[in-house]
A protein has these predicted regions:
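Non-transmembrane alpha-helical segments in soluble domains
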Residues: 2, 25-29, 33, 46-49, ...
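A structural signal for well-ordered alpha-helical segments within the folded catalytic domains
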Residues: 19-26, 40-43, 82, 131-134, ...
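Cytochrome P450 catalytic domain signature, combining two hallmark sequence patches
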Residues: 56-57, 107, 156-160
Length: 177
């Protein structure tokens, strides 16, 4: 994330705190002097602008990608990220069978359905297998995420911790797999 705000952020400064797109709206409201509604997720990034460490900042984050099979053909997955590790769970039906899992792709008139129909008309979809697959990366030793260490000797403890964290995020955010 790159932000230019000359009166409040020093040029070429860096912040390594974990931020997400859900933090944008709370930040804009904060900069405008408005309170964030209680129902709105995310946290204002303004405390990070000073460059000093922020004591009460998130220690992990959750993300969910669910637009398969349209757009990029990236399989459905969700995951958690901590300062050191990222655990990713790829799941779901493959190919056109995945449409039954995506409530928008099967609903006529939605952009997802329009995209799906356009891609189907040019035989864009393959008959991908159904999957249930995990990846784990040590971001400290493998920042480019090239070496999946899930299931490798010595990773069982962190896998268990991150799976519990992922389950808690899913429960608290009411995420259906």
């Amino acid at each position: 994330l790159i932000i230019s705000y000359p009166k409040h952020i020093q040029p070429k400064s860096e912040c390594n705190q974990m931020v997400q797109n859900i933090d944008f709206a709370p930040t804009f409201l904060d900069l405008a002097g408005l309170d964030k509604p209680k129902y709105m997720p995310g946290t204002s990034l303004q405390p990070l602008f000073a460059g000093a460490p922020v004591k009460k900042w998130r220690k992990s984050l959750y993300y969910h990608y669910y637009d398969y099979p349209t757009y990029h053909l990236v399989r459905k997955h969700d995951g958690v990220r901590t300062e050191r590790y990222k655990l990713i769970h790829f799941y779901g039906k493959g190919g056109e069978r995945a449409v039954v899992e995506n409530k928008y792709q099967g609903q006529p008139g939605t952009r997802e359905n329009n995209c799906f129909n356009a891609l189907k008309s040019i035989n864009y979809f393959t008959d991908d297998a159904d999957i249930d697959y995990w990846e784990l990366y040590d971001i400290k030793s493998d920042p480019n995420e090239l070496h999946n260490i899930y299931g490798k000797p010595g990773t069982q403890k962190i896998e268990k911790e991150l799976k519990k964290l992922l389950a808690n995020y899913r429960k608290n955010l009411k995420v259906d797999e």
